[in-house]
Amino acid sequence: MAPGCKSELRNVTNSHSNQPSNEDDAIKVFVRIRPAEEGARSADGEQSLCLSVLSQTALRLHSNPDPKTFVFDYVAGMDTTQESVFSTVAKSIVESCMSGYNGTIFAYGQTGSGKTFTMMGPSDSDNFSHNLRGVIPRSFEYLFSLIDREKEKAGAGKSFLCKCSFIEVYNEQIYDLLDSASVGLYLREHIKKGVFVVGAVEQVVASAAEAYQVLSRGWRNRRVASTSMNRESSRSHAVFTITIESMEKSSEAVNIRTSLLNLVDLAGSERQKDTHAEGMRLKEAGNINRSLSCLGQVITALVDVGNGKQRHVCYRDSKLTFLLRDSLGGNAKTAIIANVHPGSRCFGETLSTLNFAQRAKLIKNKAVVNEDTQGNVSQLQAEVKRLREQLSQFTSGQLTPGSSLARDKEKANYMEYFLEAMLFFKKSEQEKKSLVEKITQLEDLTLKKEKFIQSNKMIVKFREDQIMRLERLQKEARGSFLPEEQDRLLSELRDEIRTLREQVEHHPRLAKYAMENHSLREENRKLKLLAPVKRAHELDAQAIARLEQAFSEVSSTETNDKGLQGLPPKAIKEPSFFTSTEKLKVQLLQIQTELNNSKQEYEEFKELTRKKQLELESELQSLQKANLNLENLLEATKVCKRQEVSQLNKIHAETLKIITTPTKAYQLCSRLVPKSSPEVGSFGFLRSQSAPDNDILNEPVPPEMSEQALEAISEELRTVQEQLSVLQVKLDEEEHKNLKLQQNVDRLEHHSTQMQELFSSERSDWSKQQQDYLTQLSDLEKQLQDAQTKNDFLKCEVHDLRIVLNSADKELSLVKLEYSTFKESQEKELSQLSERHVQVQLQLDNARLENEKLLESQACLQDSYDNLQEVMKFEVDQLSKNLQNCKQENETLKSDLHNLVELFEAEKERNNKLSLQFEEDKENSSKEILKALETVRQEKQEEMARCEKQMAKVQELEESLLAAENVVSCLEKSRESDKELVTNLMNQIQELRTSAGEKSEAIDTLKQELQDISCKYTAAVADKEESKELIRRQEVDILELKETLRLRILSEDIERDMLCEDLAHATEQLNMLTEASKKHSGLLQSAQEELTKKEALIQELQHKLNQEKEEVEQKKSEYNLKMKQLEHVMGSAPEYPQSPKTPPHFQTHLAKLLETQEQEIEDGRASKMSLQHLVTKLNEDREVKNAEILRMKDQLCEMENLRLESQQLRERTWLLQTQLDDMKRQGESSSQSRPDSQQLKNEYEEEIIRERLAKNKLIEEMLKMKTDLEEVQSALDSKEKFCHRMSEEVERTRTLESRAFQEKEQLRSKLEEMYEERERTCQEMEMLRKQLEFLAEENGKLIGHQNLHQKIQYVVRLKKENIRLAEETEKLRAENVFLKERKKE
């Protein structure tokens, strides 16, 4: 792109994008339209634009048949400024980089669309100081201004390190622009750093100027070539990367933030028919287009992925896309400047650029803060907690508006749950605060009371000494008191014991112990609210009441036995009190330990009972299922037995019928009928003839056959019954096995569900406890951190104030020294100047005499000069009047000339019209046209003659003006000669005066030089010391960095090991669970297979049973038939007495058969009853087991209660034993101390007086300490108020500083825009001047190229215009200098 074209570009103004967006980290897209250059006209003179800006966020592409409208984050027109582009696009990205985010800015567009101008600025000037400098230099300035601001705010607690690298992608090869000898570099990927270039030079910079030097050094190595569309076309993609590392130290933790700012200038897409590229240029264009097409494919794939499609993003197809992977859909905040050309000849490339920008706008990145915190574990944990709290606050207050309805519902539910949780959290926090306040109050109370106890201990020691002394005296003077005196002494001692007991009862430590006991009782009460514990406690209370009653009776009997012995004084003195307190302490500790043990045992017992309950529930479930199965089986057996009984009844009836019916016996007729007598032969013959058939049918069955038949039937029945019993046994066994398997399966399923529920409940409890502990820890750590930060801040302020005071003291001492040296030098100089003054006074007297002579001659010359001045004024007035007249005439002539030019133009147009008319109507009006032309020519000649006359007049006036100017110049020369004489004389005098001043100034300059040299020497020494200190600090920093790096590596190794252990543990648990699940599945599968086998076997047995039943049915049917026949025979027997009867053994056999059948029926009923009895027995056993379980639970509770009760009784007996021992000791001491009671009384009174005095002294000391404490408290309050005031002052200064910084940035941007506006106005003036020259030349060509007077007039006008423009340029230059000085200030 030509530099002249680039300088005409204007940038986008800001409006809305300084603030970070709320809609994730979507890529920001800004469209910039470059202005159309002067050479944009086509061959036939047309100039058309294919774009128009509708608003700050929309533009329209004029396409046929329908125009297209595009919406972006910002649309810049042709007349926007570079400062506006920077404030809109780059400011927010640079601020994000300061906060720890990665940022990328790159320009995209066709060749010649202004990408390099947008990123760098004009190429034919110093970009870093030029008013039209681009985004990259302005980003440097703003970045380092933010760094300086952060350093000023944080001081030595925050440091920054900036490193620059500059690479280019040329023909799909990567080259380092900072190393001209570099060959193709390679891209590598790191898990934390992301994609980086191996071997790229990174140069450390400390200011914007150094960064720009690095940029310009690399820019000179970039590949640039000329094409038909752009004189300086970029042939490679350039990526300038700034790595910003900030290290902030807060107490013991070190926060390190690392961010990357990528500033990318892409090469433009090209068309060979437009650029006419050949050879190497064509190859370069192909590689550029290929990489840009890969970039477009990546953006399309990212858009599809964002819409929910499964797409592979081809980052590795091009070096450019792989290098910018984090900027496109990764960890970065990205801004794209799409540069387009408004010309209609670039319509295709403009449309493709806008489509690319519209697709890129849909991509959303995932930018995160690249921060690493180093320090000790507590600080890191506190930082993690703080960040978690910030995250929870951020998530609680943020709602994305553009989500779907389902997500809105889920978020609404989540917000409700979160609000409830926050309410509970606030309540818990309030309760915790109240408890903490209560604890602090109690701790203060305990501290005060402990002090009081310490004072009482001192008193007690004194009393013990006095008691020992009294005991010695008592031993020496035993038996000297009367009984009345002894009684009185004993009463006084009892009163003292009573007061001491009251003191013991109201002792603060006892109150503390009472409070602790109260809290423990509350916990115990909560534990006692459980139902089994309540029952046990009721029993315990009854037993305790009985035991206490017995103990009170025993103690009363013991006290009665001991008599009316008085209490000795030694027993009630302070040692016993302290022993009792120590015992109470021991008892309290024992109670606490026992309570903890009981709690632990209760938890263990609870866990055991819970496990047993789970097992019993599983057994109960399995037994219930087994019970159901047994009930079903019982019902089935009942039905089966009922059917069998009915079938047996039917068989019995049929057998009876078969037995009673006769059978045919043709062969047995002769054998069974006996020989008849002759008397009855005829009668028998008649009977036999009358019914032969009936005789055969009514022939009785022989007993042998009936017995055989019955035996066959009974054998068949027996075999069938045996088979049936065998099958029934097998079926029962299989059902029993099936029942057991089913019970096992149910038990396992129930156990697995219970274990899962238990696991989930324990996990939830553990997570809740962990969360509670974490919240408590985070709150405490936050409070501690806040206190530490306040303390550090105050310390830093005190340190700064001390430094300021020290520096002020040093400056004051230096000023005093300088003042003393200056005073001495002034005195010396005054002495020297006094000597010189005398010498100069003499020289002045001589010069005064000479001056008087010169004044006389000057007076003469002045008179002549005044005369000449008056003459010159008169002549100048005359000439000025003539000049004004000439100017007026010149103006009139100009207006006449303008009118003539207009007439000439009109005549010219009319002439053209007439020529056209002449061509059209050549034959009709040729003579009239010729006459008109002649008249026009005559008028033209007259006008030309008139113009020549006027030009001659103007020339004469100019000659007269020149002559007058010559006269004036001569007069001025004579005046200047006179002035020169006067000035020479005055100069001589002035030289004499200045010689003395110069010498004094020389002395001053020498002194000043000496002071400058000394200052330079001291500055050089200070610089040397500073450099040494800086080197030392850098070495220390390097050592610290090495140490932090080592610690970081160690921490990472430890974390890796922990993660590996966690992974191994998780894999082991997973393997165990998978094995257990496999075992369970195998067991279930085997059980299912066995069930299927059993079912198949049951079906086979059922089939056989059905076959057997069918056979039995057939046999029964046969048996029934026989029984019917038998019954028929039995019925017909009385009618025929002469026929043979059924044998008696047949009836007995039938009775036996019936008995067996009845016995079988009874057996079935008995089996049914036995089954019912078995079921009832199982139910009874289950109830018995449940009762036994409850009884065992009750026994456990009772055992626990008895244990507690026995422990309490043991403690009470121990207490009573100790009290009994004390009472015995007291009795012994009282028996010894009775004789010396009076003396003891006196000594006690003296001791009491001394104790009162000591008590008063202690009270006074305590009051003094209270007053001192109040004074210290007031001083502390004043200090706190002062600290609060100072913190408010610091906060106010911070707000003022931020406001001043913002105002400064706004003024700077406005100033930059003014500079750009001025440059633009200068360019527009230059363009207007060129147009004016062009029009003047055209005017001269049209009018005055044949007239010398007109040429002279034209030259004069040009001179005047040139003078005016020179004056304007001088004004603008002065204004520019003024603005630059103001900017420097």
Curated annotation (Swiss-Prot):
Q: Which InterPro entries match?
A: HMMR_C, KIF15/KIN-12, Kinesin_motor_dom, Kinesin_motor_dom_sf, P-loop_NTPase
Query: Which residues does this entry mark as bearing Phosphoserine?
Result: 1139, 1167
List the expressing tissues. Answer: Expressed in sympathetic neurons.
Reading the lineage from the top rank, the first entry is Eukaryota
Which Gene3D superfamilies does the entry mention? Kinesin motor domain
Q: Which family does it belong to?
A: Belongs to the TRAFAC class myosin-kinesin ATPase superfamily. Kinesin family. KLP2 subfamily.
Tell me the function of this protein.
Plus-end directed kinesin-like motor enzyme involved in mitotic spindle assembly.
Protein known as: Kinesin-like protein KIF15
Q: Which organism was this protein described from?
A: Rattus norvegicus (Rat)
